[in-house]
Each structure stands twice: as C-alpha cells, then as structure tokens.
Regions:
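Catalytic, metal-anchored helix/loop core of enzyme active sites in primary metabolism
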Residues: 56, 289-294, 299-302, 317, ...
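Short, small-residue-biased leader/transition segments that mark boundaries at the very start
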Residues: 2-6
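Substrate-binding/catalytic subdomain of NAD(P)-dependent oxidoreductase enzymes
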Residues: 304-305, 312-426, 431
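Rossmann-like NAD(P)H-binding beta-loop-alpha module
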Residues: 255-258, 262-321, 331, 335, ...
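Long, charged amphipathic helices and adjacent flexible linkers at domain junctions
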Residues: 28-55, 122-125
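Charge-rich, low-aromatic oligomerization/scaffolding segments with amphipathic character
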Residues: 22-39, 102-118
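N-terminal glycine-/serine-/threonine-rich beta1-alpha1-beta2 phosphate-ribose binding loop
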Residues: 124-130, 134-227
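Rossmann-fold NAD(P)-binding glycine/threonine-rich loop
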Residues: 216-227, 237-263
Length: 472
C-alpha cells in the first residue's frame, strides 16, 4: 500500500512511503514503468531507503497557528533527530515526517514533552562521579525531586550513575535513596567505551551528562557527547582549562548542536562568577581587569598560620579538614589557581593558555619533586623563614593572600601582602573573592565573595547549571 508522498520544492525528486516488506516490489515496478526515462538519463533509478519510520502530528488547533512546524522541527533538531522528509496537509491539520526507525521512540517522547502532552518536562541525567561533590548532588536532587515536579513541572530523571569502578544505566531511572547499594550490586564495569556507548546508544531526549570527577579521561568524552546532542555540566575543570582550541571547539559544538556546555563550578564552587562575566560580556561590557583569591585551600593555610601554628602544620590541617587535595603539593603549586584564572580569562574574551600565566610561588621547586613522604619530611624546614616573615607582616598589619590577576591581557598568580584597606584583607576561612573591573565598573569594581570550597556548595552550583538547562 502507498503511504505518504514527499515532493521537494525544487521539483527534482519525489519520495514515496511504503512498508518495508513492499520496498523491493515498489522499486521493481517503478523501474519497469520508467525504464525508458532511466535509459535516457532523464531520471535516476529508483532506490529504497529502509528502516525508516513516519511520524504524524494531528490537531484541529494547528490551523492558522504560526510556529507549530518551526517548534516541531526545532525541538527535533536540538535532540539530534534528523528529519529525512516532511509534508504538511493542505487542511493544515497535520504534519508528517520521516526519521530513522532507531529515532522513533525518541521522536515521540520529544514531541509529547515539547507540546505539553506530557505532564512534566523531563531532564534525563547521567551523573558521573559520586564522591563528595557527586554524592552531595544526588542527595540534593533526591530532596528536591518532588518539589520540582509539583511546583515547576520539572522531572529530574537520573538514568545513569557512574563511578570509577561501576556504572549502571536504565531508562526507568533509579531510586536515589539507595543508589550506592544498587550500583554495587547491579553496576557493570566502568570504562570510557562503556560509558560512551551506553549514553549514545540510549539515544534519550533532553539528556545531560554531569561530570563530578577530576578525570581527564572523562573530560575527553565531552566532544562526542555534545555531537550527539547531550548537554554537559562539568564541575571538572580540565576541559575548560585545556588547550584553547579544544575549549573553543567544545563551546562551538554545543552552540551548533543546540545543547549546553556549562561549568560554573570550575571557579568559586557555587559562586556566580562565570555567569556574571558572561552576562557582562553579552550586555556589551568589557572586562579590563580581574583580581581574585580563588584557592580556598591556600586562603585557609594563610589564615591559620600564626606564632602557635607553623606553616607546615597549617598544610597538614588543610589536608585533615579536606580542604586540600590528598597530595597538598597540587594546591601549593598553584596549578589549580592557574586553571581557574585561565578559564575566567577565556570567558572574559582573552585567548590564554596555562603556560602563559606567570607564577610567583612561595615553596621552592624542589619540594614538588620526589614522594609525598619526602615532602612531609622537608616542609618543616620552611617554618622558621615563614615565621620571621609573618612577624614582619604582623607589625605592618598586613595579611598574605595568593592572588590571581589578569590585566592588559597578561595573567599571573602569586603570594601578595595586602593591607587593611584592601578588599582581600578580611577574607576568612576558605572563602573566595573576585574583583571585576570593567568599562562600566571602573571606579568601583564589582565584587563577588563567599564560600569557594566544599561539597555542598559545589554540588549546589552544579545543580543550578542543570536547572538553567531546564530554563526553570
């Protein structure tokens, strides 16, 4: 039987929809009927494209309602569904289109969600990394799920949970009150290929990959996921601070595919720093200068150092309080601050690599060599010098701050002495602070300050990025 007929506007091709079982016969009879035209080169031989599906949306209210077709095809495109052919009835009460049969289920879900035939808007989440930040995020989602459904019509559906050893995926989602035990019992071995194949293979609409790891391997998945119309929310700062060309490519792919690549928590945990810079830039402002204290660990260390607590002890305290990395040399090297400054500079419109950042470190280079045990043995040798310098600092009523700075396109990080009249002077605990000098905020820079470390606030920042994808 003959289904739909699709004719191109240019009038140089016509497509006919038939059942898969009738495809060979249809080609045979048409090639016989048009044998003379084919022989003369007037038309090409008739060929069959198999494993396709026709979807039709029908509704009386479609008549004289502008934008229905645009909304339909825009929604399909944002979810990576390719429309092979389409037709609209002259009565304006139906639109039919052809897609790959593998995309049929996804197409139906997308249409139902977009045209409010579904009770809720759904976001399908793949959460990678369930340590301190990822675990806190899952708990925050669990606590908010019911409220978001009732008050915002948004259903957060966790369809994938991944850690370093195990991974589990299900279209039906998971019980977040018992996810660790379920992962332990039902999870498959976790590796990059499995993660990629499962997410892409599920081909599920409104998908978001949430990276709460610090893994370069996981960050290498972003490009492929974005190309398959999966949005990416990253607490992981490796990709955004990698080679500039890679950073730009990820943002370009996301824009072209109509999905999001968000990484607000790369700098300042839950503080709205990157979004603020983006808002300033998009509204026509220009970032002239950035000054910031971006390491909660280093700020904690320099706030704790005193006559009673030597430098080496403050490092140990930061490790015990889980402010620092397990290997605190990562924090002391300034690498983390350099990455954060590079990300801010790029978001502010500057093309900067990590190697371009000038470093003025306060620990000799040889302390970063050898084992961690060697470091702990050597670091007390720095205590006397730091105490002598601290006493001078105390007499001058100054504090140490490890400052990241961008000015005139040049970036630097280093230990600075700040006086009582400086905005950084009273910065407490592990807090972060950033000053933005712009064309509009030139005399009095914009200041953002608050908790810059901690699983709860970082997870909340990741959650906020997820919510922005839902436009709630």
């Amino acid at each position: 039987g003959l289904g739909d007929v699709y004719k191109r506007q240019s009038e140089n091709s016509t497509s006919i929809g038939v059942r898969n079982a009738d495809a060979d016969l249809a080609c045979e009879v048409l090639n016989e009927e048009f044998a003379k035209e084919i022989e003369m080169g007037e038309i090409s031989p008739i060929l069959a494209e198999r494993d396709l599906a026709t979807v039709a949306i029908v509704g009386e209210n479609m008549k004289h309602t502008p934008g229905i077709a645009g909304k339909l095809f825009g929604t399909l495109g944002r979810n990576g569904i390719n429309v092979i052919a389409c037709a609209q009835g002259a009565s304006e009460t139906n639109i039919s289109f052809v897609v790959d049969a593998k995309s049929l289920r996804k197409s139906l879900n997308v249409i139902h969600d977009s045209f409010f035939l579904s009770e809720y808007q759904v976001l399908n989440l793949f959460i990678c990394g369930i340590g301190t930040v990822g675990g806190s995020l899952v708990e925050q989602i669990r606590c908010q799920q019911q409220k978001l459904m009732m008050e915002n019509g948004l259903k957060l559906h966790v369809v994938g949970i991944i850690d370093a050893a195990k991974a589990m995926f299900s279209r039906d989602g998971f019980d977040l009150s018992n996810f660790r035990e379920e992962l332990k019992q039902k999870g498959k071995d976790s590796n990059l290929q499995t993660i990629r194949e499962e997410i892409v293979g599920m081909n599920i609409f409104n998908s978001v990959f949430v990276d709460c790891t610090a893994s370069a391997d996981i960050a290498s998945l972003y490009k492929d996921l974005l190309q398959h119309n999966v949005s990416v929310v990253a607490a992981n700062k490796i990709a955004a601070s990698s080679a500039y060309e890679n950073y730009r490519e990820l943002k370009t792919i996301a824009r072209q595919r109509g999905v999001k690549y968000l990484f607000e928590t790369n700098v300042g945990a839950g503080l709205p720093i990157i979004n603020t810079i983006n808002d300033l830039i998009h509204s026509g402002d220009k970032i002239l200068k950035i000054e910031a204290v971006l390491s909660g660990t280093l700020n904690y260390i320099f706030n704790k150092i005193s006559a009673d607590i030597p430098f080496s002890r403050t490092i140990k305290m930061a490790q015990e309080e889980r402010y620092s990395e397990p290997d605190p040399r990562i924090d002391l090297s300034g690498k983390d601050v350099i990455r954060k400054l590079v990300i801010l500079a790029r978001e502010a419109g500057y093309r900067i690599e990590q190697e371009d950042v000038e470093k003025n470190l306060f620990v000799p280079n040889d302390f970063f060599e050898g084992s961690l045990d060697d470091f702990w043995k050597k670091v007390p040798s720095l205590d006397a010098d730091f105490e002598a310098r601290r006493q001078v600092l105390e007499k001058e009523n100054k504090h140490w701050r490890f400052v990241a700075k961008l000015e005139n396109g040049k970036a630097s990080v280093g230990l600075q002495e700040v006086g009582a009249n400086h905005p950084f002077y009273g910065l407490e605990g592990s807090n972060n602070i950033i000053l933005l000098t712009t064309e509009r905020y030139k005399e009095y820079p914009m200041m953002i300050q608050g908790y810059g470390a901690g699983a709860g606030v970082t997870a909340a920042g990741v959650f906020a990025d997820i919510m922005s994808i839902a436009n709630v």
